[in-house]
Amino acid sequence: MSFFLSNLTNDSRLWKVSHNSTDLMNSPETLTLSLFCLICLMTLVALVGSIFSLVSLLTMQYRTVVSMLVTSWSVDDLLSVLSVAIFMVLQWPREAPGYFQSLCTTSALLYMCQGLSSNLKATLIVFYNFYTMHRTVVSQSSSWRSGQVLGVALTVWAVSLLLASLPLCGWGVFVRTPWGCLTDCSSPYVLLLFAVYASAFGLLAVLSVPLTHQLLCSEEPPRLHANYQEISRGASTPGTPAAGGRVLCLLPEDVEIPALPGTGSSLSSDMVFAPGQPAASSAGAGKRENLWTPRGSSSFPVSLAQKRFALILALTKVILWLPMMIHMVVKHVVGFQSLPVDMLSFLLTLLASTVTPVFVLSKRWAHLPCGCIINCQPDTYSVAFDGKKSKRKGFEFNLSFQQSYGLYKMTHADYYDDDDENPISYHNPKKYECEATKEPREDNHGVFNTITVEISTTPPLDSATLTGVNKCTNTDIPEPKQAVSEEKGAFSIKTECAINYGEATSFEGPERRLSHEETQKPDLSDWEWCRSKSERTPRQRSGGGLAIPICAFQGTVSLQAPTGKTLSLSTYEVSAEGQKITPPSKKIEVYRSKSVGHEPNSEESPSTFADTNVKIHLEVLEICDNDEALDTVSIISNISQSSTKVRSPSLRYSRKENRFVSCDLGETASYSLFLPTSDPDGDINISIPDTVEAHRQNSRRQHQDRDGYQEEIQLLNKAYRKREAESKGN
């Protein structure tokens, strides 16, 4: 060891490098001990990191094109470690043996080859990300994509090796330097290397400008659940009649579908390959992965994170090689030589071989980076409920009902703070442009959360044949009849939304209908709606794909019916696939109801009992330990009463999932709601019988007393039209 330490000197003076390729045997002054230890440490880090990256990426169950290209990056890092290790060996003996010339040549060849390969692959990865993010048509020739990725990697290695071996063919020479073996900068061969590097760097810089904005400077794309888009493809599902709800929303077919920020217009081109997977099945795997649902260990957020991290690593690697390339050209052009700059440039290129393992963290850090890395917005729920639980948030959504069971899609507007009117936006799969106006309303608990629900069990109606129906939302727009009375304002908030749908995806199969994040822990204290343990495992109905879903409201219930009476409430049982939920009887506090009216069929004569669309106003007062944190949710349902045997849906609403689901109660004519509490054994199920005959009597009364009788639903519709006219006038 003494001969090695004596060869490592603390003298900072370094020998002049010979410019003769035959002088590889003549060693320049050796490294100082501190630099030698630093290079050894960085080489060890690069070795461990490259092995870790290779093992992690090769053992992935499903690999994307980006991950496969990064795997080849790890091989380049191993080549860099090997080239530096060879030169470290050359530092040991005082007198160089005869085989040192071939070792130094091998070290220089590997160093230049991995440098060129690393930079070319950085540009290739950025180009692939740019291509997939802006691709509008999925290629049909993707069956050989996995083989193509390997072929591209081998091609890059072959080109890099060819360029690096030109000095062996007589163009350029390899010389020894104090920090390694490299090409002679006095040869025109340096200009060729710089031209290749500059071309790759220029293309990478051009493509990185839009990618940086898409991948790094935009919020994380929302995690769209299958049932949202599955139902949202039409504003009205079969069995949804014209309803009295007031939600002006554009259909996906009526608006231009823009690309989501950070996602591009085609997400399905990021292919996924499983180990041992046939090449012919790779296309299907890639297609399924990008339906915004997880497939194995690969999901869309992870795929997007891989693109983000790959972009960062590509820029990092190319920039770390920039000082070396510039210094080589400067030495060739003006003959400037600075050994400290040489050493710094070499250390930066060695550092470029240590950053690849960061890519493996893309799966764990799928949410990073966001908002240009620094401006990451806090969680919406934590903003909405941090410290001021007594604030009311207004939101409105649209609900469609299909054949007495199924999943429902809601579109809610931004949350609004009543104090400053500043919206707090959800990470919603749609963009909203909303205006909220308020009308006075008597309320003992402050401003209500207003939710508009449209439900029906009637046969499908052709919107083209309906007069006075908003074809966008399939909602009624009746003619005005009388001036609006201010003291009879029935709603506190009206929201007009223009919804711009971001991505249109399709989902198949009932097993995809119940979609939620299992990693989120239920917590009643922060008012995020939870699921009970009994509902973690989907229990499918025999009649369709509906599973008994997540939890809904908790609190007291009041019913407002056209009869002006308080309807009785009772518990009921829900059965599914042999499993039965029988909650205990619970006393429900019911407030005196208030008539919200109905719209009789104008074509029927007053003497007949015509079928009517009856509106039931249901208010749920949420309960929590803090009395100041009361929050009221209003539901307006449109139930078509055609007979006493009509079947109304049983609804469940999840605020976290932002959707309604329902169960068919068989032949029971009732309007039912499931109300879980913080006590698993104290969950409440209520059933509100539909007083069909009372509704019909009320309808006949309206026909017989046309001149002076007007229900609030008519006033409400007139108020809607007035508001709409004012908004259009402004």
UniProtKB/Swiss-Prot annotation:
Ranges facing Cytoplasmic side: 56-68, 132-148, 210-308, 362-730
Disulfide pattern: 104-181
Membrane topology: Multi-pass membrane protein
CDD domains recorded: 7tmA_GPR149
Signals that turn on the gene: Expression increased during the early steps of astrocyte differentiation.
GO CC, one annotated term: neuron projection
Residues in the Extracellular compartment per record: 1-34, 90-108, 170-188, 330-340
Transmembrane segments: 35-55, 69-89, 109-131, 149-169, 189-209, 309-329, 341-361
One term of GO molecular function: G protein-coupled receptor activity
Function text: Orphan receptor.
Protein name as catalogued: Probable G-protein coupled receptor 149
Organism: Rattus norvegicus (Rat)
The encoding gene: Gpr149
